[in-house]
């Protein structure tokens, strides 16, 4: 598409004012006529030809354009600090910088002045001395060896020889075992007259294995490590190293090497046999899960709870047939799943029993009860039909729920909980809590009187109300102490109540005995009557005083009953009336006589009637 076509599409006029200029003529330069390889190289460039810049050659061009002087080198001596011979000196080439040396010398002279210059003949150390790492072997004294390092098969000289080899060869055990040549020194015998000791005893040499050398070295190292720093003060890496060396087992190391050697030297047939055994083991492991499930199902079938029903129903042929039909029906219903005690439901869906055995026993008992007057075959045919009817919807729903539920866990007994350390803690609320809050709740739930009683008991035991250091163990013991104190106070409360009831009944008994006693003769002198009335009044006052003492004790404990309190109040009123008018008869004597029981028809004296009135009022109030 040309420019004129574009202008026609865009409805633009011709932009040319004058005549169009003619095209410039291309001046085609003569192309070189190349042939062969030069032509192919020229064509590789395409439209952009390769520019070939001619190289300007110079005659006898200088090789090095730098005008710097050549570096100077010198032979410097040095030493190697890793070597034991300090006088051994070596030499190597080092670059010498004259300018830098001149500047350093001038600066040192200016800064130091008249100070003595350091020695120039000090030798530099080798750069490879830092790679010579010395192994630290355990060191011990004669006393330490005699105390903790003695061994039956090892002497001190041989142990020293082993440690020297370990230090020389940097604990490279193959080299140590290869260079280990211990010859025990000869023991001289008795000398002859001429002084000849030809009867010297040379002990036999003993060959040491690599594991024996390791075991002896690790034993010495672990014991000396524990002697220098106790085990309880070691860090975690030090303790791990100590445990590794102290529990080195040479026999296990030998077995490991033998196993590795046998694995490397086995033949192809043995390798194939081992591979086949490994494949068989994998198959066994793959089938083990299914085998375990079947075994668990069998155990569940055998480990059923004992039934309390009578087994006489299963002694007949009809009972056995009915039992077999029930078991088959239960298996079909559960689709060959495990018959757990909580998962088995009754096929009829009426009353689900606990186990399949119980269900079959109940169904069989019902069938045996219905077969009275029938033949055994009829009972055997009708019994299973009644128990194997179609299950309604509720039974199916219960079966599904039972399948979804997990297996119930067996509850542990008290002995098993103590054996396994099972504890039951209180449920904690949200947010942080303190142990002291739990103790404060034990006090806050009590009344003021009970809190005072608990505080008094704790003061008697010299136990503070608030714990100084409420740790978990201390808090637990404190809770047990408070529980024991509460039990003690409850027992005291019940004891006081029983004592008060016993005293009340004793007073009633004494009153009844006085009522049933025969009346005295009317010819008794008036002075005698007066003395008797005074004596009775004294008895009434003593009884009232006893009741008053009981009342004060009951007020202190705060646990007296309403009946006892009423009796005490009546006793106090009676004591006041008796003390005010001991000789005057009371106004309500006739009324009191009417209120007496039918057995007390004889006349009584003033003190007896008053006590009878008190006891009757207390009985009425107790009835109310």
Swiss-Prot record:
It is found in: Nucleus. InterPro entries: DAMP1_SANT-like, Swc4/Dmap1. Its main location: nucleus. Residues 504-514, 585-597 have a biased composition (Basic and acidic residues). GO terms for molecular function: transcription corepressor activity. Pfam families: SANT_DAMP1_like. Component of the SWR1 chromatin-remodeling complex and of the NuA4 histone acetyltransferase complex. One of its GO terms (biological process) is chromatin remodeling. GO terms for cellular component: NuA4 histone acetyltransferase complex; Swr1 complex. This is SWR1-complex protein 4. Residues 356-371, 388-406 have a biased composition (Low complexity). Belongs to the SWC4 family. Component of the SWR1 complex which mediates the ATP-dependent exchange of histone H2A for the H2A variant HZT1 leading to transcriptional regulation of selected genes by chromatin remodeling. Component of the NuA4 histone acetyltransferase complex which is involved in transcriptional activation of selected genes principally by acetylation of nucleosomal histone H4 and H2A. The NuA4 complex is also involved in DNA repair. Signal peptide: none annotated. The lineage of its organism: Eukaryota, Fungi, Dikarya, Ascomycota, Pezizomycotina. Residues 1-34, 96-120, 334-411, 504-624 are annotated as: Disordered. PANTHER family: DNA METHYLTRANSFERASE 1-ASSOCIATED PROTEIN 1 (PTHR12855:SF10), DNA METHYLTRANSFERASE 1-ASSOCIATED PROTEIN 1 FAMILY MEMBER (PTHR12855). Residues 108-120 have a biased composition (Polar residues).
